[in-house]
Amino acid sequence: MRTMKGFYVLFTLHLCFLDSGKTGKILVWPSDSSHWINLKVILDQLQRHGHEITILVPSPNHLFDLTKIPFNVENLQLPVTKETLKEELDTILYIASFEMPKLSWWDRRAKLREMGKRFFRVAKRICDSAITNKELLSRLQAAKFDICLADPLSFCGELLAELLNIPFIYSFRFSHGSVIERLCAQLPTPSSYVPGSTSGLTDSMTFVQRLENWLLYIMSDIMFLYFLFPEWDEYYSKILGKPTTLCEIMGKAEMWLIRTYWDFEFPYPYLPNFEFVGGLHCKPAKPLPKELEEFVQSSGKDGIVVFTLGSMIKNLTEEKSNIIASALAQIPQKVLWKYTGKKPDTLGPNTRLYEWIPQNDLLGHPKTRAFITHCGTNGIYEAIYHGIPML
């Protein structure tokens, strides 16, 4: 009898502390290209745990394949063609890849402003397609979402969350000069030992380098606060019907999911709502398609080199392509090169071109010896995960 009584007491206590699981509705305002690849990993897990995902996808776009998106999709029709969007993106990439490296420090600031204007022009069109669509807004309000997951480099997710009166979370890597982190998220960044993003500096700086870092912060602040953000401040104030700023709304983010990990960063202060999630997309390699596997095996003991410049860089000049191909032809390894464009005249017999490659599966192959990369976050962590040297 005493045993049964004890059981009931324990069972009652268990019920007191038992919390029933609850799934929610999540609205997603994503960015295109590699940002989407990383975000989708998070969304897949959320959906696997029973949460309902609705994603807003601009049309046309760069990388979204609607046939492979297993979530609810709301299409945002843009008043531009895919060709126009591609031309705008190619121009931005051309400036960054071929014009910027040749410019002086001061001239690069002017080019960055030009690139920012072009990028924000595209972002504004995407934002308009959602915010001015009253029918869409009504559907979203009726859906009663619990939270919005957005990318701060693709403005408007935070504005949409504000209109729907729901909290929002950011998935983020970095911004130029760490502007968004410093000014909007209020992240402490002493210029004496915290190198600004894209500065190329480390946390161990000489006096001159500290001065350079400080100037980067100042110039970035001026460029964004006085030349790029004001248009968005005015836009957000108009939509919300009250004076506000882009940074003020961004600062309301409940959490910032940083797509890197603390052991791969220089040490500097972080806030409690910054969470490192780098490498979430990493996974064991799957078997390669037959044609790829045969080419990889033909490399013998020398193995293979995987070469890719990511999902966006597709505008290498003919001259640069030939220089790279000529260099690759001189190494003993077989090379798998993710490449779009005219076949280089100097392409060696050891190199094959592919418009797409299973990057993670190749990096996890036992015959892979090195990874030539533009240092995109996804590729870096896949190479670390599989233990592959990077160039």
Language model: regions and residue ranges:
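Long, low-complexity segments enriched in small/aliphatic residues
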Residues: 249-266
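Conserved, non-catalytic sequence blocks in retroelement Pol enzymes and Pol-derived host proteins
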Residues: 244
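Glycosyltransferase specificity loop/lid
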Residues: 2-238, 257, 264, 276-286, ...
